[in-house]
Amino acid sequence: MAVQKNRKTRSKRGMRRSHDALGTATMSVDSTSGETHVRHHVTADGYYKGKKVLSL
């Protein structure tokens, strides 16, 4: 099992974690229903790119 020789400082730990944050999801407005949804995902009422793809 790997064990570190020297303890990592708070600074080095923070530098490593600096890339772990999640960005906000980009939202789009559907052209047909005007509903806000996550990009590249079907809306709640079944529309994608202005076309009905799911019958709910």
Curated annotation (Swiss-Prot):
A GO cellular component entry from the record: large ribosomal subunit
A Pfam family it matches: Ribosomal_L32p
Transmembrane parts of this sequence: none
Record region (Disordered): 1-37
InterPro entries: Ribosomal_bL32, Ribosomal_bL32_bact, Ribosomal_zn-bd
Any Gene Ontology biological process: translation
Residue ranges with Polar residues bias: 25-35
Top-level division of the source organism's lineage: Bacteria
Record keywords, A-Z: Ribonucleoprotein, Ribosomal protein
GO molecular function: structural constituent of ribosome
Biased composition regions of type Basic residues, renumbered to the chain: 1-16
UniProt-listed PANTHER family: 50S RIBOSOMAL PROTEIN L32, LARGE RIBOSOMAL SUBUNIT PROTEIN BL32
Stated family: Belongs to the bacterial ribosomal protein bL32 family.
Record-linked HAMAP family: Ribosomal_bL32
Protein name: Large ribosomal subunit protein bL32
UniProt organism field: Pseudoalteromonas atlantica (strain T6c / ATCC BAA-1087)
Gene this chain is encoded by: rpmF
